[in-house]
């Protein structure tokens, strides 16, 4: 392998909005996530509303002018 072309692989902390902190190694410095293994709805069995309004609004704006005609 060539030297000097690979990104630096360093210790990283992954922080979830629930407060869980995971230490691992990555090429990124610090990573912030919305859902982790401690608060994921499938694992905890609790219902959690995930905000996807931004994506839905962008989709609706993008396809607002498209007619719903079937050929």
Curated annotation (Swiss-Prot):
Superkingdom classification of source: Bacteria
One Pfam family hit: Ribosomal_L31
Gene Ontology MF, one: rRNA binding
The record's free-text note on cofactor binding: Binds 1 zinc ion per subunit.
Record's GO cellular component terms: ribonucleoprotein complex; ribosome
InterPro entries, A to Z: Ribosomal_bL28/bL31-like_sf, Ribosomal_bL31, Ribosomal_bL31_A, Ribosomal_bL31_sf
Cofactor: Zn(2+)
SUPFAM superfamilies: L28p-like (SSF143800)
GO BP terms: translation
Annotated keywords: Metal-binding, Ribonucleoprotein, Ribosomal protein, RNA-binding, rRNA-binding, Zinc
Ligand binding (Zn(2+)): 16, 18, 36, 39
Keyword Membrane: no
PANTHER family in the cross-refs: 50S RIBOSOMAL PROTEIN L31, CHLOROPLASTIC (PTHR33280), LARGE RIBOSOMAL SUBUNIT PROTEIN BL31C (PTHR33280:SF1)
NCBIfam families: L31 (TIGR00105), PRK00019.1 (NF000612), PRK00528.1 (NF001809)
Subunit architecture: Part of the 50S ribosomal subunit.
Function: Binds the 23S rRNA.
Family listed: Belongs to the bacterial ribosomal protein bL31 family. Type A subfamily.
Name the record gives this protein: Large ribosomal subunit protein bL31
Underlying gene: rpmE
């Amino acid at each position: 392998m060539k030297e000097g072309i690979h990104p630096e692989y360093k210790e990283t902390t992954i922080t979830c909005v629930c407060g869980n902190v995971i230490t691992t190694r990555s090429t990124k410095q610090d990573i912030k996530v919305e859902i982790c293994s401690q608060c994921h709805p499938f694992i905890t069995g609790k219902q959690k509303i995930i905000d996807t309004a931004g994506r839905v609004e962008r989709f609706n704006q993008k396809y607002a002018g498209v007619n719903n005609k079937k050929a």
